[in-house]
Amino acid sequence: MGRQRLPVIVGFGGVNAAGRSSGHHAYTRMTWSAQSGAQRNRTLAALTTMMGLEPGNPHEQYILDHTLIRRIEASHFDVDAVDWNQRLPMQNDDQPVHFDLERRHLPDVIPPHWVVTDNSVTHVSVQITGQQAFLLPTKRAFEVKSAGQLPTGFEPGKLYPSRNHPRGLQMTVYAASDALGSLGLDWEDVTRRVAVDQISVYAGSAMGQLDSAGAGGMLKSRYNGQRVTSKYCPLSFAEMPADFINAYVLGSLGSTGASLGACASFLYNLRNGIDDIRSGRARVAFVGAAEAPITPEIMEGYSAMGALATEKGLRQLDGLSDEQAPDFRRA
């Protein structure tokens, strides 16, 4: 039986609601009460830097309150005033609706029950009879108000030329850099010994990039009266985290892609990397996954499945009245 190469994990990194993965800082934050004072201090120092806080000042309680699962912060969206379009049906047979508007705002296809009259070169008068449905931009309170968010104040897109990249890809670049930093070697030392086509990258996003800089913007721009840009579609691809690791961090030429399987996406990518090393297709494998699903649209989808704790549900679990605030940390 021939010898088989043994894959060895030589570094890891990332970022999540508990902070940086490297140095076991995220693990320390999640197991805070069980950690020694020395390990807590190291993690506090790391989070102080991440969150842009002034070193040397006591920030422990602030850091604890602004990491892990908590009330969704305004940097994502206002949970008390989420934008949406309310359907507004109107029926006007006896008293037609009249309004004036600029000619350039007329729809390309005039509805059959509209009567358009010229007022001037630039403006027209519109009369509507019969039934007409409008979409009224308004606000509403979001049912789900808690999520695991990156530490308050940490914005990965500010650490490199992000150029309006979706948040998941910003996190990917930071996470890959964090993993390389934990390696203990300069990446140039590795590439001097390993050919660029012997380095494989497997990383993806099961949901894709669905915020406003990716597929989210592509899908809702026209409905909001905006234009679709050329970046929305390509930046939303599910395998784009692997492409970004290559483009911004590694510059390798080996196998690149992603296997997707909901919560198991990372494990599938890990298997791909292990198979590459065992088979000899690669000497180095870089694997990961990135998800940034804190948007009203995605969270509403999961909430409809019953997969997220609503504010009302938390109150019912704790026996609270409508006036009492639930403990969002327990969501």
What are these regions (language model features)?
Residues 254-261:
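Short pre-catalytic strand/loop immediately N-terminal to key active-site residues, enriched for Gly-Thr
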Residues 266:
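Short conserved active-site loop signatures built around small residues
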